[in-house]
Amino acid sequence: MMSKIKIIQADSPAFIDQVFAIRTEVFVHEQKCLPSEEFDELDAVAQHYLLFENELAVATGRFRKTDKGIKIERIATLSQYRGKGYATELLHHLMEVAQTTYKEANCFYLHAQVSVKPLYEKLGFISYGNTFMEADIVHQAMEKSINA
């Protein structure tokens, strides 16, 4: 049976609970990040999205406007749903919505875990600067011009 995929903005408390549940599973339990590092004051200002397979929320991500451009953050897919292209689909959606919402922005940027850098490279993101530690995980700063 084909999986039915849908992406929605997590704009209700119930949806935000699902966002936080996915992030808790992936970042806190699986990757051992501290909850105090994973959940921050930016959750209140970012736009959050959920990707559903059939009726189950399996991936999430957020973006927000900054002085530099549009920062994409907290991309997470539940482990048993990885490898299906869901993060790619979610990222395409986030970039499309963000670009429409913030027409004046000229770049997307993010801090990629080095292990998933190829995902972002496939989407046209380019590394810059040295790798660095964030929540005890090696990260690489990456950006993509919106007009490229």
Can you describe what each PLM-predicted range is?
Residues 50, 56-64, 69-76:
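Conserved beta-strand in the GNAT
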Residues 2-38, 43, 48:
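Short amphipathic alpha-helix that is part of the acyltransferase structural core
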Residues 46, 77-78:
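N-terminal, polar/charged subdomain of small-to-medium soluble alpha/beta proteins
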Residues 81, 85-93:
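Conserved acetyl-CoA pyrophosphate-binding loop and the N-cap/start of the following alpha-helix
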Residues 65-73, 82, 104-106, 133-139:
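A conserved beta-turn-beta hairpin within the catalytic core of GNAT-like acetyltransferases
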Residues 109, 121, 126-141:
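Conserved catalytic-core motifs of GNAT/GCN5-like acyltransferases
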Residues 98-112:
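Conserved GNAT acetyl-CoA-binding A-motif
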